Amino acid sequence: SEMCIRDSSTTGVGLISPPPHHDIYSIEDLAQLIYDLKCSNRKAAINVKLVSEAGVGTIAAGVAKAGAEVILISGFDGGTGAAPRNSIHNAGLPWELGLAEAHQSLIMNGLRSRVRIEADSKLMSGRDVAIAAMLGAEEFGFGTGPLVAMGCVMMRVCNLDTCPMGICTQNPELRKRFKGKPEYIINFMRFMAEDLREYMARLGVHTVDELVGRTDLLKVKDAPAGSRASEMDLTALLKNPLVENSSVHFNAKDVYNFGLEKTPDMRVLMKKFKKSFDMAEPKPMTIELEVGNTDRAFGTIFGSEITRKFGNTLPEDTFHVICNGYGGQSFGAFIPAGLTLELVGDSNDYMGKGLSGGKLIVYPPKDVTYDRSENIVIGNVALYGATAGKAFINGVAGERFCVRNSGATAVVEGVGDHGCEYMTGGTVVVLGKTGKNFAAGMSGGIAYVLDEDWDFYTRVNKDMVSLEPVEHKYDVSLLKDLIREHVEATGSPRGKEILDNFGEYLPKFKKVLPHDYDKMLRLIAQMEEKGEDSEQAQIEAFYAMKNASNK
């Protein structure tokens, strides 16, 4: 139950791990994500992990231009126990290839001093670390070695909650077997450092910084004549490009400047809300301003300051911003409880990404002549990865609406393809048509979809969900309350029509419910009826579900 709270998921319901990053389809999307993350924590150094592959150097250059401070090159032989075994043994390339290409590409593009390069994947000795440094790495990641030092026996059952050494399990009986101590890790790292020091001494190098990029100290070992290894040409791997005025080390002075001081959050929101923000208990306050589609991640910086000072404790609508115009990409990303953004206009992609308790309201200007419920007002990938909060959209959303939503509540008047994909929690109400592949990979949460043409079943992915009529009094009450709140927030004519004729529209709604989620909720309810408290009921239901699946 602790893990599920952390992951905003449901006890006993399986998750796809790792979930696909449906907010990244190009280097531009990645650049936007880096910008969003920087806005959400201005003090953070953004680290981007790239898998070693042919062409990774080009991607690394794009990542550096986008403002990342650390690029991690990860190889194929890492020891993760949660990945499929065929991936562990058959997918990927050695970290040496990707590391060398990324390092060389950054030097040739004059970007090497902007970023630190990290390498990982089975760095098991000082020799491995020395080679990584000579190929361009400045930082090094260790996973398998420290785990083995703590007692891991590489059973590769990390995802099954059956770790015999008590390391990767929530089972209290198995956790009693854990014998690891912090001193074991300290000893491992000390011996690793000593091994590295000995190699450096033999090479005549005094510091790790001096070792970075020194491919001239590496020599290709001769392979037996006629062997496959003898046919390999490693010249490119050991190439040491010398570009004028280009460093081979990270320089903090060359870090990318995002210009966050010029954003509306810093110029307007932080100043206008300052008086209320400085109070121990802020008084509700509303401001109005114009926004444009170049104002990316609007509200994110101010939201991060709210989180830093108040956490998620502020009442709804404490800080209310009425925006007129066009919301840029990632409008309202990551905003916390207490912050409400009301947009009179439309918004670009990623609206409400990572919504964390705040409220988003979007509707067209009152004087529009088109049918609001048939026009797109927000772009693709809205509410991606939302964990809490509310969103009311008077209009149609683009594709991949509420992907990996795990706790937010949303009302919208139509969505594109792949709506509610990989959703694990929360509630979504769709007062219009959906695109194809709705609810693919949806393992939690509930969606209510208005099916006026009785053809929704042709567009839903039925692998993990079932369609039911909305009949239970709890569902009817919740649906009606959410539509009412939607109308109050946006003035939606479509929502008002449905409310005024609710008895007529109710039979046309379909409830989308994941199979395992439904089973788990029923088991938890049964345990609570037996007198178990909520937490214990979840634990008992989890093991009941697990035992049933093992039979």
Give the predicted meaning of each segment:
Residues 174-175, 186, 199-203, 212-215, ...:
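Long, distal/terminal scaffolding or interaction modules
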Residues 3-5:
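Short, small-residue-biased leader/transition segments that mark boundaries at the very start
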Residues 55-66, 124-137:
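Catalytic cores of alpha/beta
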Residues 68-79, 89-102, 134-174, 450:
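Flexible glycine/proline-rich, aromatic-decorated loop/lid segments
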Residues 1, 45, 53-75, 339, ...:
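Carboxylate/His-rich catalytic cores and anion/metal-binding grooves
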Residues 49-54, 114-127:
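Glycine-rich beta-to-alpha transition loops that act as phosphate-gripper elements at the mouths
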Residues 140, 144, 151-215, 219, ...:
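Active-site or pore-adjacent capping/gating segments
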Residues 37-45, 65-73, 104-116, 133-143, ...:
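Secondary-structure transition/capping motifs at alpha-helix termini
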